Amino acid sequence: MMKVLVVVALLVTLISYSSSEGIDDLEADELLSLMANEQTRKECISKHHECTSNKHGCCRGNFFKYKCQCTTVVTQDGEQTERCFCGTPPHHKAAELVVGFGKKIFG
């Protein structure tokens, strides 16, 4: 039963990884076409660093590309601003946990 769960988790991880690659490629193509006249793309943004001004510029992690995650922050003046950082979405964290667990079991 455990082997079946590990195999299913690996399949879900592979499908998620391949779909994430396809979506990232589409987003990158759209972004590049919009930025054709602007300066060349800057280096990617590391995990936990701010991506408010470049939401598609996050680096790749071990298995997946980090996603720019945003939240609304209210300052002491009562002004609302959006702050974003590159991070790993929960479903990607779960997939990485399953793969790590599988590596420990199967060596």
UniProtKB/Swiss-Prot annotation:
PROSITE patterns membership: SPIDER_CSTX
Tissues in which the protein is found: Expressed by the venom gland.
GO molecular function: toxin activity
Annotated S-S bridges: C44-C59, C51-C68, C58-C86, C70-C84
Entry keyword set: Disulfide bond, Knottin, Secreted, Signal, Toxin
GO CC annotation: extracellular region
Entry protein name: U1-lycotoxin-Ls1i
The record's note on its domains: The presence of a 'disulfide through disulfide knot' structurally defines this protein as a knottin.
Prosequence residues removed at maturation: 21-41
UniProt subcellular location: Secreted
Leader peptide range in chain numbering: 1-20
InterPro entries noted in UniProt: Spider_toxin_CSTX_knottin, Spider_toxin_CSTX_Knottin_CS
Predominant localisation class: secreted
Annotated family: Belongs to the neurotoxin 19 (CSTX) family. 04 (U1-Lctx) subfamily.
